[in-house]
Curated annotation (Swiss-Prot):
Subunit record text: Homodimer.
Record flagged with keyword Ribonucleoprotein: no
One Gene Ontology biological process: homoserine metabolic process
Region (Disordered): 387-415
Entry binding sites for substrate: 226, 363
Described purpose of this protein according to its UniProt entry: Transfers an acetyl group from acetyl-CoA to L-homoserine, forming acetyl-L-homoserine.
Subcellular location, record wording: Cytoplasm
GO cellular component: cytoplasm
Pathway the protein acts in: Amino-acid biosynthesis; L-methionine biosynthesis via de novo pathway; O-acetyl-L-homoserine from L-homoserine: step 1/1
Residue ranges annotated for the AB hydrolase-1 domain, each copy included: 47-369
Protein name: Homoserine O-acetyltransferase
Length: 415
């Protein structure tokens, strides 16, 4: 159902669009792919900005004033960045965010109704980042949006943004990739694999067939997967600052997961309480099968797939690019962004790699808007010449050999 809200300084569209038959990269065809989106501001024909959400995010990127968003995400996930007078100023830009296929916030996915009237479950076609991009392109066609002023993405949304430069290079003027990379490294692939195993090992997963009011859902497995995710998103320093070794009162949450026999003797620590809380909240709002599908899509993405190199994949893109990385992010490191910047430079794409000093880990792109907003907003407005945009390459070419980043811990378990 389409909804349009207009308040002073705000115009918000929220809708689910049936874009018709859609062939996935796997070759499987969905007869009626439904795509959910939200859009903010007024479209003037040349001011459209597409924001690509993170792994378990949704189309609810900005606040509505009333803050009534999609299920379980009443709070906008980037509300400090998108909105009137903010970095992505909806007084100037028509900002669109699309829930990707395979997710569970209105776009078709495993929890959606299939042709037989039952949820698809694991019969839903496998999805890739390329599928996300093509679905977004079709949704934008439906909205009458052609060339995009900018595509912006954070985390796996940054991979989605990069894919726009490969699949639709003529449709993007400016590309902003925040806390992302050209591909996952083997450590992150391994952690994602364990997270999926946690879900599929839960007896309630039942091969992906757990839908229905009278069915138990694999909340324990999904919760464990989310806990692994949160350990990836935080840095050693931020965890030490937030939790240290402090004990917490067990209350109800201390019994959220089965305890080992000696648990009563040892303290229930604040870090455990935090992880248990995040697990409980996540299981209330997200679908376990969607988590399996979306992590597979992220793991599978490789910018250079089908090309000789990352640079070759980006060669057709003639716009400008901003890469934002964070010194405390070991999920997507500054080194990975610098490598990506080098790929852009090798094909003469104007690029700036803006490094943010932060110890907040991967979450920095969400929790430090005061550091992300200025370079992002200036880039979208003015390109790489934007006032707040900095670059690791001191002369606009190859990076200075003396350039040194703050240390990034490569392993969660060695810190």
């Amino acid at each position: 159902m389409s909804r349009t809200r207009t308040t002073p300084g705000r115009r918000v569209e929220s809708d689910v669009v049936d874009i018709g038959e859609h062939e996935f990269e796997s070759g499987e065809i969905l007869p009626d792919l439904k795509v959910a989106y939200e859009a903010y501001g007024e479209f003037d024909g040349q001011n459209a900005v597409l924001v690509c959400h993170g792994l378990t995010g949704s189309q609810h990127v900005a606040g509505h004033g009333t803050e009534s968003g999609v299920s379980g995400q009443a709070r906008a996930w980037w509300g400090d960045i998108v909105g009137p007078g903010k970095a992505l100023d909806t007084n100037d830009y028509y900002v669109i965010c699309v829930n990707v296929p395979g997710s569970c916030y209105g776009t078709s996915g495993p929890a959606s109704e299939g042709p037989d009237g039952e949820p698809w479950g694991t019969d839903f076609p496998p999805v890739t980042v390329h599928d996300w991009t093509r679905a977004q392109r079709r949704l934008l066609d439906h909205l009458g949006v052609g060339r995009l002023h900018a595509v912006v993405g954070g985390s796996v949304g940054g991979m989605n943004a990069l894919d726009w430069a490969v699949q639709f290079p003529d449709d993007v003027e400016r590309l902003a990739v925040v806390a992302s990379a050209a591909r996952l490294d083997s450590q992150c692939l391994g952690i994602d694999a364990v997270a999926r195993r946690a879900i599929t090992s839960d007896p309630n997963w039942n091969g992906g067939d757990y839908y229905g009011e009278d069915r138990a859902t694999p909340d324990a497995g999904l919760g464990l997967a989310r806990q692994l995710g949160h350990l990836m998103y935080l840095s050693k320093d931020s965890m030490e600052r937030k939790f240290g070794r402090r004990s917490a009162g067990r209350g109800d949450r201390g019994d959220a997961f089965p305890s080992d026999p000696a648990a009563a003797f040892f303290p229930y620590r604040e870090v455990e309480s935090y992880l248990d809380y995040q697990a409980e909240k996540f299981a209330e709002r997200f679908d376990a099968n969607s988590y399996l599908y979306l992590t597979r899509a992220m793991d599978d993405f490789d910018l250079s797939e089908g090309y000789e190199s990352d640079a070759a994949a980006l060669a057709a893109f003639e716009g400008e690019s901003l890469l934002v990385s964070f010194t405390g992010d070991w999920h997507f490191t500054t080194e990975q962004s610098e490598s990506l910047a080098g790929a852009f430079r090798r094909v003469d794409v104007p690029v700036a790699h803006h490094v943010v000093e932060s110890d907040h880990g991967h979450d920095a792109f969400l929790v430090e808007p005061e550091k992300v907003g200025p370079p992002l907003g200036d880039f979208v407005d003015e390109g790489v010449a934007g006032r707040a945009v900095t670059d690791t390459a001191t002369d606009g070419g190859e990076p200075d050999e003396e350039e040194d980043f703050a240390p990034v811990h490569s392993s969660l378990f060695s810190r």
